[in-house]
Swiss-Prot record:
PANTHER family: DIMETHYLADENOSINE TRANSFERASE, DIMETHYLADENOSINE TRANSFERASE-RELATED. Specifically dimethylates two adjacent adenosines (A1518 and A1519) in the loop of a conserved hairpin near the 3'-end of 16S rRNA in the 30S particle. May play a critical role in biogenesis of 30S subunits. It catalyses: adenosine(1518)/adenosine(1519) in 16S rRNA + 4 S-adenosyl-L-methionine = N(6)-dimethyladenosine(1518)/N(6)-dimethyladenosine(1519) in 16S rRNA + 4 S-adenosyl-L-homocysteine + 4 H(+). It is found in: Cytoplasm. PROSITE patterns: RRNA_A_DIMETH, SAM_RNA_A_N6_MT. Gene3D superfamilies: Ribosomal RNA adenine dimethylase-like, domain 2 (1.10.8.100), Vaccinia Virus protein VP39 (3.40.50.150). Pfam families: RrnaAD. This is Ribosomal RNA small subunit methyltransferase A. InterPro entries: KsgA/Erm (IPR001737), rRNA_Ade_diMease-like_C (IPR023165), rRNA_Ade_Mease_Trfase_CS (IPR020596), rRNA_Ade_methylase_Trfase_N (IPR020598), rRNA_adenine_dimethylase (IPR011530), SAM-dependent_MTases_sf (IPR029063). GO terms for cellular component: cytosol. Keywords: Cytoplasm, Methyltransferase, RNA-binding, rRNA processing, S-adenosyl-L-methionine, Transferase. The keyword Methyltransferase applies. It is an enzyme of class 2 (transferase).
Length: 262
């Protein structure tokens, strides 16, 4: 592996370099030859090489043009991925060569500074994917997989858990990266749910979740006061206790609340 390229702090780059960890990630992602795999932020190709050994159809989306020559050189013995030199946030998954309309597997070591926008984009593309395996800050993964009545619960966890079964499947120490980050990392698995609770208005559901967590220390009654007043709704008639905080509610509670207020 060549590591000539200097990691760019502005892009949140930390290059994965431990072969055992990389093999473990690919194994956990359960990638087969027929799978269509898209890697987000391949960097220097440490993970890409193993993906090319596992699948016949690997695409990579890399924003940083300066790493692409090194990426190609590092992958040379294993094959050539389809390279898209662009921002994943603007990438159209439908543009992939996929004549059979086969769903894809997403994987990647996500830049810490834009992990949330990427996850919200993945939500929009959830009907096109089989699953996703992302490396993120361990603290972020813990928030995403958190259960009701946890102080880690938040907008991101509720929205993601509405769409996906979310699980933390591997913890990763800082020393397996170059340069070493100051935090631990973990692998998040997202698997689209086969069936979701029906919502009358999805956008309104997102708005209710956002408003409910607007000020975490406040109760639902205080955070949703303007919405309740606008709709002339008595808080005592709601399907949830508005004296609770947002962190106390389950995804199902938020669905019931949004449907009631729609």
């Amino acid at each position: 592996m060549q590591y000539k390229t200097k990691a760019k702090k502005s892009l949140g780059q930390n290059f994965l370099q431990d072969e055992n960890i990389i093999r473990k990630i690919v194994q956990l992602a359960n990638i087969k030859k027929h799978d269509i795999v898209v890697e987000i932020g391949p960097g220097l190709g440490a993970l890409t090489r193993y993906l090319l050994s596992s699948s016949n159809n690997v695409s990579v989306v890399e924003f940083d043009a300066s790493v692409i020559d090194t990426l190609i050189a590092n992958c040379q013995k294993y094959g050539t991925p389809h390279i898209y030199n662009q921002d994943f946030l603007k990438f159209d998954i439908s543009s992939l060569e996929n004549s059979s309309n086969q769903k894809i597997k997403l994987i990647g070591n996500l830049p810490y500074n834009i992990s949330s926008p990427i996850l919200f984009k993945v939500i929009k593309d959830s009907d096109k994917i089989v699953d996703a395996h992302f490396m993120l800050q361990k603290e972020v993964v813990e928030r995403i997989v958190s259960l009701p009545n946890s102080k880690s619960s938040g907008r991101l966890s509720v929205i993601l858990q509405y769409h996906f079964d979310c699980s933390m499947i591997l913890k990763i120490p800082p020393e397996v990266f170059y340069p070493q980050p100051k935090v631990d990392s973990a692998i998040l698995r997202l698997k689209p749910k086969n069936s979701k609770e029906l919502l009358k208005n999805y956008n309104f559901f997102e708005e209710i979740v956002k408003q409910s967590f607007a000020q975490r220390r406040k109760t639902l009654h205080n955070n949703l006061k303007s919405i309740l007043k606008e709709r002339k709704i008595d808080p005592s008639t709601l399907p949830v206790d508005t004296n609770l905080r947002a962190e106390n509610l389950s995804v199902g509670d938020f669905v019931s609340l949004a449907n009631f207020l729609s």
